[in-house]
Amino acid sequence: MDKIKENAFVKKIGFNSLVLFCILILLYILFAVLIPVVNSDANANFVTWAHILSAMNYACFMGFLSLGVTFVIATGGIDFSIGPVMFCAALIAGYQLTTNGWPLALCLILCILVGTAFGVLNGLLVTYLGLPSFITSMASMMIAKGLGSVFTKTQPVSWPQLSDASGNGWYRNLVRMQVGGMTVPTGLVLLVIGAVICAIILNKTKAGRYILCIGSNREAVRLSGVNTKGWETLAYILCGTLAGIAAIFYVGVYTTVQPGLGDTFNNEAIAGCVMGGTSMTGGVASIGGTLIGVLIMALLQEGIMTMGLQINYQYIITGLIVLVVVYADLRSRRRRN
């Protein structure tokens, strides 16, 4: 009976997600043991709340990017515009806040609307005009980078600090908040809530089932009378909306936004998604896996920086991990076929 219950538990949470969680714990232990050996600095102690908070700061905005692109990849598509779209949303909304004096709440909503607009654009171009998602998202990436730069006249935009006299710094509490003298990673809490909502959409709704079916066998779904264009467009809209939400958390962490950037976040978001078990060929996706994949990415970045190494090492390790994961996914699919 106990074994049956155990198997049911593993099946419910997903075997791959369970394996990823074990990898996350082992990675943390590895860094905790290795960092004091590699880095003799007295401050190079990985087992501190400060390092955990730093990793969570990165995870909270990267997580929303990865959750969004999970929906697109589930359809068999790709979106390389999410990073620049996040920056574009933060630049436009921040410019309206600091230059034109718009209310902070309205600017936060504007972040989401800008991201959603790019999602609608990408979805319509891919589904109704039949453009390849790779080309479409590359074009949107350039448009987002250019639009943000033109809007701000190529100048960086600085969002208010928490201590700002205007009182507009409260949005930073969305990322971290002081409670009884302790810093709480509220961004991670909100990310988990967002992941639960995304998991419900993907696994418990008609929209999610159609998105996965489109990625698995688009033609069969179309012949069954389903509006594949509409559901696929929805996947891109969700991706854009979540990129807009990610912009809010990004400025909550870094405050200052530079125009013309954001490309590297595309690769990191997609890597977290793929690492979490979402198939690049579509039809298979795991929101829980994506969340853990992002946490692994965050831990990897924080660990490498604490070791005193350049961030480029993270790119090398992440690239190798993605190659292994994609290769394993292709081998698994060939065996099933």
What are these regions (language model features)?
Residues 2-64, 100-106, 337:
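Membrane-interfacial amphipathic/re-entrant helices at transmembrane-helix boundaries
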Residues 101-141, 292-293:
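Alpha-helical transmembrane segments within multi-pass membrane transporters and channels
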Residues 1-29, 33, 196, 216, ...:
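Cytosolic-side transmembrane-helix boundaries in multi-pass membrane proteins
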Residues 31-32, 48-100, 125-131, 277-287, ...:
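Single transmembrane alpha-helix segments in multi-pass membrane proteins
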Residues 20-33, 69, 112, 141-146, ...:
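Hydrophobic core segments of alpha-helical transmembrane domains in multi-pass membrane transport
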Residues 102, 107-108, 118-122, 181-256:
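Helix-loop-helix "hairpin" substructures at the membrane interface of multi-pass membrane proteins
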Residues 7, 134-137, 141-204, 231-234, ...:
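Transmembrane helix-bundle core of multi-pass membrane transporters
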Residues 236-237, 243, 253-318:
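Transmembrane alpha-helical segments in multi-pass inner-membrane proteins
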